[in-house]
Design a protein with these regions (language model features):
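Aromatic/hydrophobic pocket-lining residues that form π-stacking "cages" and hydrophobic walls in ligand
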Residues: 57, 127, 208
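Short functional linear segments
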Residues: 1-46, 53-66, 71, 107-114
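Acidic, Mg2+-coordinating active-site environments of NTP-dependent enzymes
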Residues: 109-112, 135-142, 158-250, 263, ...
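Positively charged, low-complexity/disordered segments
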Residues: 389-391
Length: 391
């Protein structure tokens, strides 16, 4: 199969599969000769900020000369973005090779009556094949959905776990309360393994604390009160993070205030791992300043920003940053996936910002929502002075 044919095949997987058990994923990895002891794993779950935290940690480890694999989702342009090794996405040739290796195992399993892996499970197996082949030492894994039953949660002895901010999302799968969703995310916490977590939502934080205590896992909570802004330029933020005995000034190359929490989670995680990695405080601070992560209040051109917020909490943070950055009434170009809670998203977008105009489009994907549906929702929420257009 060609690269294009492989991509088309993978995109078709959701149409004929459903999520499998962790035992199914373990069986697939075992047949690929992948073993947990080959990696030092940092496992990251949460509703928002997972990718950014992974990116900060990845940047520090790579700059220090470590062999690092980074598995994240979703991708922005091409699927190879999900598999990053030493700071660079895998090549198309490596992508094809990993697909062929996994497909061979999948064929064997199907011949024995076992189900085909789901979309995310398939990509996870491809990533693990690549990371093993390239002999990475540190492996940063971002969960796909939830935590407890996520395909990435097949490893029992990670080096460290991190849980970012938690909000209502995928309620039909994870539960319809913060407590339930936090419980699913906390499912990545392992016996005796340190966990760093965002404590800005006390309800979620208490669930995480209780889980950590039950697992005898050392835990470190990052509160909003521990963060203090020094300066925001529109491209960078200078701020201070204090955990009671360590005070550090950090500079991050992002204009969005929510990245302060993500950077602090990453800094605390790397501090906890300092004996393991040998990376000192000054090196951590310096490397974090060089972090790049696309699609998170990313300035593409002067006065043009991209943001991939996909739930109400993420969009609320997006709106907050628009209010701080915009010098005039801003224009919104908006689209969303069909399965997301677009009604709640539109409600948040209409509450706080007086948009000059709103342009609705469709993401070039079969899951993109019809702009006419979005238009109806914006019309129901808008005030008289707002204009809504569609493209």
């Amino acid at each position: 199969m060609t690269y294009e044919e492989i991509c088309n095949y993978i995109y078709e997987i959701p149409k004929f599969t459903k999520k499998n058990s962790l035992e199914h994923t373990k069986e697939m990895l075992q047949r690929l000769s992948i073993r947990e002891h080959q990696f030092e794993i940092i496992h990251v779950a949460g509703s928002n900020g997972k990718g950014s935290v992974c990116a900060f940690i990845n940047q520090v480890l790579v700059e220090h000369g470590c062999e690092v694999g980074l598995f994240t989702s979703p991708h922005l342009v091409c699927m190879e973005e999900r598999f990053v090794i030493n700071g660079k996405k895998c090549s198309q040739e490596e992508f094809v090779e990993s697909f062929e290796a996994v497909q061979k195992v999948v064929g064997q399993m199907e011949a024995e009556g076992l189900p085909h892996p789901a979309f995310f499970e398939y990509l996870f197996a491809m990533g693990m094949y690549l990371f093993q082949k390239r002999k990475v030492h540190y492996l940063i894994l971002e969960t796909g959905l939830g935590g407890r039953l996520d395909a990435t949660n097949v490893f029992e002895e990670p080096l460290l776990t991190i849980i970012t901010s938690i909000s209502l999302e995928h309620t039909q799968i994870l539960g319809d309360s913060i407590e339930a969703i936090a419980g699913e995310k906390a499912g990545i916490i392992k016996e005796g393994v340190p966990v760093i977590f965002d404590g800005s939502n006390e309800t979620a934080a208490e669930v995480i604390r209780q889980t950590a205590r039950a697992k005898r896992a050392p835990y470190y909570c990052i509160s909003l009160e521990s963060l203090k802004i020094h300066k925001i330029t529109g491209k960078t933020i200078d701020f201070c993070y204090s955990n009671g005995y360590d005070v550090v000034d950090l500079k991050i190359p992002f204009p969005a205030e929510y990245q302060m929490m993500n950077a602090s989670l990453a800094y605390r995680a790397l501090s906890v791992l300092q004996v393991e990695t040998g990376i000192g405080k000054a090196e951590i601070i310096s490397a974090m300043e060089h972090t790049r992560w696309m699609g998170r209040m990313q300035q593409a051109e002067p006065f043009i920003y991209f943001d991939g917020a996909h739930n109400a909490d993420g969009i609320a943070h997006f709106v907050k940053n628009v209010q701080k950055i915009a010098e005039e009434k801003p224009v919104l170009l908006f689209s969303m996936m069909e399965e997301k809670n677009y009604k709640e998203a539109v409600k948040v977008l209409c509450q706080e910002v007086a948009w000059d105009s709103i342009v609705l489009t469709r993401i070039p994907d079969s899951r993109g929502i019809d702009p006419l549906k979005l238009q109806d929702e914006f019309m129901a929420n808008r005030s008289e002075e707002r204009r809504v257009g569609k493209e």
